[in-house]
Amino acid sequence: MNVEHEVKLLVEELKRLGQPNSDDKIVVKFGVLFNDDRCANIFEALVGTLKAAKRKKIVHYDSELLLQGVHDHVDIVLLKDE
């Protein structure tokens, strides 16, 4: 899979798992995304896909590094619906 395709799949999964926040942006906790069986089967490197999406300003999260357990509470915010 290429990065563009994985980012598109990530957007779909964020929409599936997320809830709108007060700004009407879709938000998912990293732990929910990381522990989801469907996401585990789709993404070989979820954190790498999230980083690529963050660089493209498609998602936002307040951490440089995301680690399972440590950062499960971090919000992943969908900025662009692409």
From Swiss-Prot:
A Pfam family name for this chain?
Answer: Costars
GO biological process, any: regulation of actin filament-based process
UniProt similarity note: Belongs to the costars family.
Q: This protein is called what?
A: Costars family protein v1g158749
What organism is the protein native to? Nematostella vectensis
